[in-house]
C-alpha cells in the first residue's frame, strides 16, 4: 500500500461477513457520493444535506438488489476527511458482496486493509498513535483495555508527545539564540544549566510514561498465566471455574491434559491468558511427554504462575520440584480440595498461600485480589485521565529517546560544548516524532496499516 496520498474512491464491507441484522458497505473519496447515487433509487444523494440517512433501494438495471438506508457525510467532517457514504443493507454474505461489486463496477476501487484509517492519518485527522488505538479498541478484551484504547484514540498520548517535542524545540531554539547572540559574559554556563535542567525534565517525563508500560502491556496483550501442578490436583477444574465454562477436559484419570490449553478470561478488567499445562512429571507416554515439555516452556514464559497443590494429600517430590522451579516467578500458591480433610504439611509451604475449593467455588475471588496486589500494588488498574504505554513500538521508541537524553547528560558531565550536544537532543525530538508518525518511515506506516481489517 503506497504511502502517497491517493484521491480515488475506495469501498469495502465494514461489517463481519456472515448472517446478521445489517451489513455496511462503506465508500470514501471524491466521487463517493456520485458513485453511490448511480445505484441508489430514492432521493438524489448529491443534493441531500450532509450527515443524513436516506431511505431507498440499491438497483441495477432497474432490478432491486436490496432495501437500504444510505448515510451521506460530506468532507471534511468525516472519519477520513473525505466524502463518505455508508450503505446499510440487510445482513448476509450474498447481498453485501453484490452491492460491493456493483459499487466497484460503478467506479470505486476495492480498499486495501486499513485504508480508511490510513486516509484519516494522511489527511491529518488522526496521528499514528490514534490510528493504532483504533486497532487496540477493536481487539480490546476487557472494559479496562477499552478505556485505555479510547483515551489514546482521544489523543492523550499524542498530546503528551507533541507537547514534549515542542518543549525540546523551544530548548534547542534557546540554545541557538544564546550561542549566536550572547547577551551575557557567562552565556556558556547559562546555556549549559538550561540544557541540563531541561534534559532532566524530559527524562523524568518519559521515565514516568515508561513506568506505565507494564500495566498497559498487560491490558493490551493479557497477563500470561500458567496453571501448574502435578497430575489430578484440579488444574483443569480451576481453569473451567475461572472461565465459568467447560473448556478443558476434566476427569479422574491422571495425565488427562496432555497438551497446553490457552483461554482468555476477564478478571476484574485484567485479560488473563490462562494456560492450563499438562502435569509436570516423568512419563514414558510420547504424547504426554511433549505436553510436559510444553508445560515447562509455558512456565518459563509466564507473567504469572498459579501453582495448584492438593491439600488432602501429603506433599510429594513432584510438588516440591514445582515449588522449587517456580520460586522466582510471580507465583500464587493454591491449596485446592479444602472441602476434604487436610493432609498436606503446610509448615513446608510459604505463608502467602490461598486455600481454595474449586468444587465448591470457595475463595476463588481471593485469587483475583492477589493478582491485583502482585501486579498493580492494590492501586487499581486504570487511573482516570492517565496516559498508558501499551504498544511495543511506542515502548521501544521511548527507550531510545531516553538513551539519547542520557547521551546529553553524559556529554554535560564530560564538559562537551553545548552545541555538540544538540545532535542528541535533536535525535530525541526525531525519535518521538516516529511515535506520532511525524517522522516515521513510509515503510513502517504502510506495514502498520496493513494489519487492519478490510473496511476499517
UniProtKB/Swiss-Prot annotation:
Question: Keywords assigned by UniProt?
Answer: Cytoplasm, GTP-binding, Hydrolase, Magnesium, Metal-binding, Nucleotide-binding, Potassium, tRNA processing
Gene Ontology molecular function, alphabetical: GTP binding; GTPase activity; metal ion binding
Q: Which residues form the signal peptide?
A: none
BP GO annotations: tRNA methylation; tRNA wobble uridine modification
* Residue sites binding K(+) per the record: 232, 251, 253, 256
Per UniProt, (6S)-5-formyl-5,6,7,8-tetrahydrofolate binds at: 26, 86, 125, 456
PANTHER family per the UniProt record, alphabetical: TRNA MODIFICATION GTPASE GTPBP3, TRNA MODIFICATION GTPASE GTPBP3, MITOCHONDRIAL
Give the protein's biological function: Exhibits a very high intrinsic GTPase hydrolysis rate. Involved in the addition of a carboxymethylaminomethyl (cmnm) group at the wobble position (U34) of certain tRNAs, forming tRNA-cmnm(5)s(2)U34.
Self-association or partners: how does it assemble?
Answer: Homodimer. Heterotetramer of two MnmE and two MnmG subunits.
Stated name of the protein: tRNA modification GTPase MnmE
- Which species expresses this protein natively? Streptococcus thermophilus (strain ATCC BAA-250 / LMG 18311)
Amino acid at each position: 500500500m503506497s504511502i502517497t496520498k491517493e484521491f480515488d474512491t475506495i469501498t469495502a464491507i465494514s461489517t463481519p461477513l456472515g448472517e446478521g441484522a445489517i451489513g455496511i458497505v462503506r465508500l470514501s473519496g471524491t466521487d463517493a457520493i456520485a458513485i453511490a447515487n448511480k445505484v441508489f433509487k430514492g432521493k438524489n444523494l448529491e443534493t441531500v444535506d450532509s450527515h443524513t440517512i436516506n431511505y431507498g433501494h440499491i438497483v441495477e438495471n432497474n432490478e432491486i438488489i436490496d432495501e437500504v438506508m444510505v448515510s451521506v457525510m460530506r468532507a471534511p467532517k468525516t472519519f477520513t476527511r473525505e466524502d463518505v457514504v455508508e450503505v446499510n443493507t440487510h445482513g448476509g454474505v450474498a447481498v453485501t458482496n453484490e452491492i460491493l461489486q456493483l459499487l466497484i463496477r460503478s467506479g470505486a476501487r476495492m480498499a486495501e486493509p486499513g485504508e480508511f484509517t490510513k486516509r484519516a492519518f494522511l489527511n491529518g485527522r488522526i496521528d499514528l498513535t490514534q490510528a493504532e488505538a483504533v486497532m487496540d479498541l477493536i481487539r480490546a478484551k476487557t472494559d479496562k483495555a477499552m478505556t485505555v484504547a479510547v483515551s489514546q484514540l482521544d489523543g492523550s498520548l499524542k498530546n503528551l508527545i507533541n507537547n514534549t517535542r515542542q518543549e525540546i524545540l523551544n530548548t534547542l531554539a534557546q540554545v541557538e539564540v544564546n550561542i549566536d547572540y550572547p547577551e551575557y559574559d557567562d552565556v556558556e554556563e547559562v546555556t549549559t544549566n538550561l540544557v541540563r535542567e531541561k534534559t532532566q525534565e524530559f527524562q523524568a517525563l518519559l521515565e514516568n510514561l515508561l513506568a506505565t508500560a507494564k500495566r498497559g502491556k498487560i491490558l493490551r496483550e493479557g497477563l500470561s498465566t500458567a496453571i501448574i501442578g502435578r497430575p489430578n490436583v484440579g488444574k483443569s477444574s480451576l481453569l473451567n471455574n475461572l472461565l465459568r465454562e467447560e473448556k478443558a477436559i476434566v476427569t479422574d484419570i491422571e495425565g488427562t491434559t496432555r497438551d497446553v490449553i490457552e483461554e482468555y478470561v476477564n478478571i476484574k478488567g485484567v485479560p488473563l491468558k490462562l494456560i492450563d499445562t499438562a502435569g509436570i512429571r516423568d512419563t514414558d507416554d510420547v504424547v504426554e511427554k511433549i505436553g510436559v515439555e510444553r508445560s515447562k516452556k509455558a512456565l518459563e514464559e509466564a507473567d504469572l504462575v498459579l501453582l495448584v497443590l492438593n491439600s488432602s494429600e501429603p506433599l510429594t517430590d513432584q510438588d516440591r520440584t514445582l515449588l522449587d522451579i517456580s520460586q522466582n516467578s510471580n507465583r500464587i500458591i493454591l491449596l485446592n480440595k479444602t472441602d476434604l480433610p487436610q493432609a498436606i504439611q503446610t509448615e513446608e509451604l510459604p505463608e502467602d498461600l490461598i486455600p481454595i475449593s474449586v468444587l465448591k467455588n470457595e475463595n476463588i475471588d481471593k485469587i483475583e485480589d492477589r493478582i491485583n496486589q502482585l501486579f498493580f500494588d492494590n492501586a487499581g488498574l486504570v487511573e482516570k485521565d492517565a496516559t498508558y504505554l501499551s504498544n511495543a513500538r511506542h515502548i521501544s521508541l521511548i527507550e531510545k529517546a531516553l538513551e539519547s537524553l542520557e547521551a546529553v547528560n553524559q556529554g554535560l558531565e564530560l564538559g562537551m560544548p553545548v552545541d555538540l550536544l544538540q545532535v542528541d537532543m535533536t535525535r530525541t525530538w526525531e525519535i518521538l516524532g516516529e511515535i506520532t508518525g511525524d517522522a516515521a518511515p513510509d515503510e513502517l506506516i504502510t506495514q502498520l496499516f496493513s494489519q487492519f481489517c478490510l473496511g476499517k
